[in-house]
């Protein structure tokens, strides 16, 4: 059985979605093109799509992705493409009705190695506002936007958006005394694929 048929998961990288990946994956539809505009270290990639695009502005993340996924590009029946461009350019370039975007922008400013600025001087809230109000309404493909807990400002803003919302909590893992949770926001209804 090849990795594509077995829906092989690759879970690694920053703590963001690492613990939640297996709970998020059932909501991700199989698509011809799978894109992560903020890939980080590629912690939630599921190898069941025809083409996978992992994008990040961080030099550290890009070098890691090239080392980690180079072997899969050669051994899988489908390409893993690694790009280093602004997330808006990445979304525009790969957008089609056959594309699925897993969009996981930084939740906080202080998570980057050596204070590396991965995008610009914008705050994470400004990125979410830009995505929800200007970019995602025009996307042809399907998408899921991942957000930190609801008690933070970003989670509150996303929960009030016009899009479908779903909160997933990890059943056992706790962080700062609370269950690890992520809010998902999408342009389509949430259903397990």
What annotation goes with each model-predicted range?
Residues 1-193:
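Class I S-adenosyl-L-methionine-dependent methyltransferase catalytic core
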